């Protein structure tokens, strides 16, 4: 019943968040390929952040601050074992890289670090989409049914 209500209230926003997550990850790849590693890790973090916001919408939770988003993600999905703890580790790591990249001009993000985080970003997005598809909230790639 809760997911049916969510579908009516949040489905469009959830789909837009996943779209933003995909675009952020694509932008991070372009930035990585242009050797803008600091900017790439920031976009990778935001890709994960948008995924988490979409996941929280499935429980009708919509925190406004980054700290609230991460806290509620841990409470609602990680501590309940609904999703793997590695996803929380990935977004925390991405958050720390983003903080460094955005706010510490003396530290340069290395190519290997950006590449590593980009890989984690793809895993995060794929696992988010897989979860949403498994809950019949998001259509699968080959699903032509109406959502």
UniProtKB/Swiss-Prot annotation:
Gene3D superfamilies: Nucleotidyltransferases domain 2
Pfam (any one): HEPN
Domain of life: Archaea
Segments crossing the lipid bilayer: none
UniProt-listed InterPro entries: HEPN_dom (IPR007842), UPF0332_toxin (IPR052226)
Family matches, as SUPFAM superfamilies: Nucleotidyltransferase substrate binding subunit/domain
Keywords: Toxin-antitoxin system
Family statement: Belongs to the UPF0332 family.
Physiological role: Putative toxin component of a putative type VII toxin-antitoxin (TA) system. Its cognate antitoxin might be MJ0141.
Name of protein: Putative toxin MJ0142
Native organism: Methanocaldococcus jannaschii (strain ATCC 43067 / DSM 2661 / JAL-1 / JCM 10045 / NBRC 100440) (Methanococcus jannaschii)
